[in-house]
UniProtKB/Swiss-Prot annotation:
Stated name of the protein: Uncharacterized WD repeat-containing protein C12G12.01c
Gene3D superfamilies xrefs: YVTN repeat-like/Quinoprotein amine dehydrogenase
Phosphoserine modifications at: 394, 397
GO MF entries: ubiquitin protein ligase activity; zinc ion binding
Keyword Phosphoprotein among UniProt keywords: yes
GO CC terms in record: cytoplasm; cytosol; GATOR2 complex; vacuolar membrane
This protein's UniProt keywords: Phosphoprotein, Repeat, WD repeat
Any Gene Ontology biological process: positive regulation of TORC1 signaling
InterPro entries: MIOS/Sea4, MIOS_a-sol, WD40/YVTN_repeat-like_dom_sf, WD40_repeat_dom_sf, WD40_rpt, Zn_ribbon_mio
Organism: Schizosaccharomyces pombe (strain 972 / ATCC 24843) (Fission yeast)
Record-stated family: Belongs to the WD repeat mio family.
Per-repeat ranges for WD: 42-82, 86-128, 136-175, 177-217
Top-level taxon: Eukaryota
Length: 905
């Protein structure tokens, strides 16, 4: 038996029946759950019930099977007063009131009342004091319990009834109900109108005292699933004082926790089934163990944030975790959140803006110095700079950011995807580069624009079975355009099988284009130049000078100086920096002084200047200044390549121009492994749009959930160059997302452009065009007016559909009647002519005529005015252009005697 102290001090009264003692204990939860005993009262045999009074001197009452009631003091443990009944019989239940009264319920006796009330102070001074009141009935009492903060007493009688007694009067029933649930009465501390009691076989009922005079007093019955009628049952009910509606039950060596919630009833007079079980969890006890008591436990009574169930298992304490019930919630396609708690629904809009397109995206520049990001575009450098320049000053500030649901939902990737779609984020790579705010995605789309233009213009020429289009530096340098994994990279690194052939092809491309691309290392120079060209780094000297001048005009002198350094124009670095601001002029003086004093051939000598330059390379924030001083300090390009704040594109250009062959191969392998694993999308400049690039994109999705960008990028090469199941999954996920948002037009454009991109170098479309989802069928023969590419589709058609808008392709001559049954086609309600003629578009099989694809699409757009259109309300039809012209000035249907009003006006 276990009861928590009413003083809320974390202590418990524990009846140890095997030792005939009662202990006043606390629970020591760490490092191991154990008792911490404060007081022990011994020689208390056959204790059947206990209760405590929470006054200044906490008093414990213990009733025994002989009827004796022992009064024990926590403040004075040596004190003990024993109240002896006139006739020996079990004391079944005790209850202390707020007004210092003690009520005891006894088993039935022929000669003495079974319900007695004493004044507590009188008993403490004289245990033989007579009761203030006693019941006139002689029925046995199984359970007694006071309603919180009231003089009303609830009693359960062995005559199978529950009574409400006003203790300000005689102990006679004010109201009562006949029920089999009369044992172990406990009152809900949060809702005193509710109380729980159990029957002999262990079923539990929840009562509402407000309906005792009606037939609706029973709220819910909780059946006991562990009934063992032949075995004696140890039963206990405990309400939690920390969370409303939590009821713990001990029955047949099994512990059950239920979360009870009240229903909302429109009619207050009807209370049937007004309580329901929202959550239930069972805590089984091992068969060879015995649980002798339960109660609720929390490590801190002042801040009860973590409530547990305390059970006495084999006389030792054991804690059972109490997990809150799962709160149902759901997101809609627009990232709004709604959740339910109890009987209410709580919607949370993702932002206070009208649309997600108005949501300001999460701006990393609030936390990172702006100059660092202006000159750095790699994903890895962003992470580095964020962690380097920022730290959370306090847990409170971090907590506030995490709890701002507007910001969390508004900057969620789903909101970002929706915002991009509305702005036209599709297959125009140049436009995509302008739409995205992330600098590394800007560079990525710029490279895809370059690669797509090179592929469309056949810039690399006819190279036979070797295709350099959409290739990155890795595939070109290792002379393997079909890299699928890192193992292929390592194999290609050692292979020399196609070296002569690829070098010859690369030399032919460079000579044909007449390009003068700078590389400091002359070995495999055509291959280096081709890799630089494919990565968008193939600037000639004239292009380099133009780019440097453009940067100087934009006052980006440091970036211009870095660009000159990366192209071997070391003498121009000082001149460019000297034309900048005061700080840049000072830095140019330092660089010039070192170059003048040491000379280019002595960069590696130890000197004070070298040490200062090395320190500056780690302390400066601008990545280009860091790179300049990293090179000046040691004249070693490896130090510059270790500068992670530089964009991957810049580091790749340095490696291709200045590293020897073996060092370049090793560096590209290491860089590839890092970028693929991290999912850095700028790494596609290295891997290209290859199966290995698809692996990088998969890791990018795993890190960002940006399936939109991955699906768009993959469409440039899948299925035109190779098949990839991952890319197909991304595409279908993105299409499904657009459909959920009901952006059917954008999804249709996505499908159309994907089909156009799937055209290979021979003009063949490798992707099957998406079938239209709307058909116009004849209302008489139920066959499609426009022929299908697959004639068998005509056999399984739905019921006649006459309302809708057809978007079929260009048609052959149809005339004014159905091509199948000859019935006349509907007439235009504006012009009166038939809706079918030779200009009405129908579906055609473009996969058979790929060379006419763009021409036919443009033809469809020009003929849109002659397409079928029908009112969804009245069913009258018209040519699309005629309907548009009519309803631009009218609101009523043009058919006489039809009063259908346009819903869009």
């Amino acid at each position: 038996m276990l009861n928590r102290s009413k003083k809320r001090n974390g202590c418990y009264f524990w009846v140890n029946g095997s030792s005939d003692e009662i202990r006043y204990v606390a629970v020591k939860a760490s490092p191991k759950v154990n008792w911490k005993t404060h007081i022990i009262w011994r020689s208390l045999k056959n204790v059947k019930c206990i209760d405590s009074f929470h006054g200044n001197n906490e008093i414990l009452g213990a009733g025994s099977s002989t009827g004796n009631i022992s009064l024990l003091s926590v403040k004075h443990p040596e004190f003990q007063a024993v109240v002896t009944p006139g006739y020996a019989r079990p004391c079944n239940s005790l209850a202390f009131s707020e007004t210092e009264h003690l009520v005891a319920g006894f088993a039935k006796s022929r000669n003495e009342s079974s319900l007695k009330l004493w004044d507590l102070n009188s008993l403490l001074s004289d245990p033989k004091s007579s009761p203030l009141m006693q019941s006139s009935t002689l029925d046995g009492v199984s359970s007694v319990c006071y309603k919180k903060d009231t003089p009303l007493l609830l009693t359960g009688s062995t005559s199978r009834s529950v009574h409400i007694i006003d203790t300000r009067q005689q102990l006679d029933s004010v109201s009562s109900v006949n029920t089999q649930y009369y044992s172990n009465i406990v009152v809900d501390p949060f809702s005193p109108n509710y109380f729980a009691a159990n029957s002999y076989d262990g079923d539990i009922a929840i009562f509402d005292t407000r309906y005792f005079k009606s037939d609706n007093y029973l709220q819910i019955i909780l059946r006991n699933e562990n009934k063992k009628p032949k075995n004696p049952q140890l039963f206990a009910l405990k309400y939690s004082e920390w969370k409303p509606g939590q009821l713990a039950v001990l029955s047949n060596n099994s512990i059950t926790l239920r979360q009870l919630l009240p229903c909302v009833n429109g009619n207050e007079g009807s209370a049937n089934n007004s309580v329901f079980v929202n959550y239930e969890k069972k805590y089984p006890v091992k068969p060879n163990s015995q649980c002798s008591g339960i109660d609720f436990f929390t490590p801190s009574t002042a801040f009860p944030t973590h409530v547990q169930i305390l059970g006495v298992i084999n006389e030792q304490p054991k804690l059972f975790s109490v997990h809150d019930e799962v709160i149902p919630f759901s997101f809609n396609p627009y990232n709004d959140l709604i959740f339910s708690f109890k009987e209410k629904l709580y919607p949370l809009n993702s932002s206070p803006f009208n649309t997600l397109s108005d949501v300001p995206q999460f701006d990393v520049s609030e936390f990172v110095d702006e100059n660092s990001f202006d000159s750095s575009s790699s994903c890895s450098s962003k992470v580095f700079l964020t962690t380097r320049n920022n730290s959370i000053n306090s847990e409170d500030s971090a907590h506030e950011v995490l709890l701002s649901y507007n910001r969390v939902l508004g900057s969620d990737i789903q909101g970002t995807i929706l915002d991009r779609v509305k702005k036209g984020y599709q297959f125009d790579s140049q436009k995509n580069s302008e739409l995205v705010s992330d600098l590394y995605l800007k560079d990525l789309w710029s490279w895809i624009h370059l690669s797509h233009r090179q592929s469309e213009e056949s810039l690399f020429g006819d190279t036979g079975d070797t295709d350099f289009s959409y290739q990155g530096a890795l595939g070109i340098w290792f002379m393997d355009t079909e890299l699928t994994s890192m193992s292929d990279v390592f194999e290609a690194k050692e292979s020399k099988f196609l070296e002569k052939k690829i070098l010859r092809l690369a030399r032919d491309v460079i000579e044909r284009l007449d390009l003068d691309i700078f590389t400091s290392i002359q070995t495999k120079r055509p291959l280096r130049q081709l890799a630089l060209l494919a990565c968008g780094l193939g600037m000639s000297n004239d292009d380099l000078l133009l780019e440097i001048r453009r940067l100087i005009r934009k006052n980006e002198h440091v970036k211009a100086a870095g660009l000159a350094l990366f192209h071997g124009k070391i003498e121009n670095v000082v001149r460019i920096l000297s034309s900048g601001n005061e700080l840049e002029k000072t830095i140019s003086t330092a660089v010039a002084g070192y170059i003048t004093s040491q000379g280019l051939s002595n960069f590696g000598s130890d000197s004070l200047w070298k040490e200062m330059s090395r320190n500056l390379s780690t302390e400066l924030e601008d990545p280009y200044l860091r790179a300049i001083f990293a090179y000046v300090s040691n004249s070693d390009w490896r130090d510059v390549l270790d500068e992670v704040s530089l964009s991957l594109k810049d580091r790749l250009g340095i490696a291709l121009r200045f590293l020897p062959d073996d060092d370049l191969s090793n560096y590209l392998c290491d860089l590839c492994h890092t970028t693929v694993q991290s999912g850095d999308p700028e790494g596609l400049l290295l891997t290209g749009l290859t199966p290995l690039g698809m692996e990088l994109l998969q890791n990018y999705i795993d890190h960002t959930s940006d399936v939109q960008t991955a699906a768009l990028i993959a469409a440039f090469v899948v299925p035109k160059k190779f098949l990839d199941k991952r890319a197909e999954d991304w595409t279908e996920s993105y299409r499904e997302l657009l459909n959920r948002w009901k952006l059917y037009r954008e999804r249709a454009k996505f499908d159309i452009f994907r089909t156009e991109l799937s055209k290979n170098h021979t003009g063949e479309i490798t992707r099957k065009a998406t079938e239209p989802s709307i058909r116009i069928i004849c209302n008489f023969c139920r066959k499609p007016i426009f022929p299908f590419s697959n004639r068998n589709e005509c056999n399984n058609l739905p019921t006649p559909i006459q309302r809708g808008v057809s978007k079929a392709g260009p048609a052959k001559h149809l005339g004014k009647s159905c091509p199948h049954c000859g019935q006349p086609l509907p007439k235009c309600s504006v012009c009166g002519f038939s809706l079918g003629d030779e200009d009405v578009p129908q579906k055609d099989d473009f996969s058979q005529k790929p060379q006419n694809y763009v021409k036919e699409v443009n033809l469809q757009k020009s003929r849109f005015g002659l397409w079928f259109s029908f009112c969804l309300n009245c069913g009258h039809g018209a040519h699309a252009s005629h309907a548009s012209e009519w309803f631009s000035t009218h609101t009523i249907c043009p058919v006489p005697n039809c009063d259908c009003e346009c819903k869009l006006k």
